[in-house]
Amino acid sequence: MIDLIVFLGNYGKKYENTRHNAAWVLCDSIEIGSNAVWQSKFKGQYAKLPSSMTPGRAVHLLKPETYMNLSGESVIAAASFFRLKPENILIVHDELELKPGILSFKWSGGLGGHNGLRSIKSVLNTADFFRLRIGIGRPDFSSQGGDASPDISGYVLSRFAQSELDVLKSQVPQADSFFKELLEADEPQTLIKKWAKVLPSQS
């Protein structure tokens, strides 16, 4: 079962609606996030889902406010307090290797150069946790010329174009369905095939 859902992002006005904050954009739009009662705890914003949504057990939401590179500090604080194992944790994060708006549920795997995932792996001592990846796509640097270094950091820290936000938010109904099924699932692995790659309804 998933007992802790972590939405990765950077804290502060300057990072609102940036690509690296795709998980926060989604969180603020979906049912479980928009209806949550958030409080400052575990070095981030924390909420417990109402018992009506998770009968017989507690499920926790977390938005680390440590900045992306130190996300693990917030995750380990919550995981230790609630005595959770890595396999009970879902990390929701932006993903360069997926086209904008695509949602992809997976178990374990590489870090893809994502500093938030790297920090979490460091504190959990394993990469064996569930992920919901949100596609932000790779930028086209062809206009920079062959000698230019691709500015990936600048890309992920820049704001979504409105068209990209529209595509992401078109996934809210799908994301709501995913989280509903996830909260009801005794074995999250059974959902991987269905939710391995969910295309946006508009692009």
From Swiss-Prot:
Enzyme Commission number(s): 3.1.1.29
A GO MF term: peptidyl-tRNA hydrolase activity
Binding positions for tRNA per the UniProt entry: Y15, Y67, N69, N115
InterPro entries, alphabetized: Pept_tRNA_hydro (IPR001328), Pept_tRNA_hydro_CS (IPR018171), Pept_tRNA_hydro_sf (IPR036416)
Residues carrying the site annotation Discriminates between blocked and unblocked aminoacyl-tRNA: N10
Subcellular location: Cytoplasm
Gene3D superfamilies noted in UniProt: Peptidyl-tRNA hydrolase
Active site: H20
GO cellular component: cytoplasm
Keywords: Cytoplasm, Hydrolase, RNA-binding, tRNA-binding
Site (Stabilizes the basic form of H active site to accept a proton): D94
Key word Cytoplasm present: yes
Catalyzed reactions per annotation: an N-acyl-L-alpha-aminoacyl-tRNA + H2O = an N-acyl-L-amino acid + a tRNA + H(+)
GO biological process, one term: rescue of stalled ribosome
Classification via PANTHER family: PEPTIDYL-TRNA HYDROLASE (PTHR17224:SF1)
Subunit structure: Monomer.
Known role: Hydrolyzes ribosome-free peptidyl-tRNAs (with 1 or more amino acids incorporated), which drop off the ribosome during protein synthesis, or as a result of ribosome stalling.
Family designation: Belongs to the PTH family.
NCBIfam families: pth
Protein name: Peptidyl-tRNA hydrolase
Lineage: Bacteria, Pseudomonadati, Spirochaetota, Spirochaetia, Spirochaetales
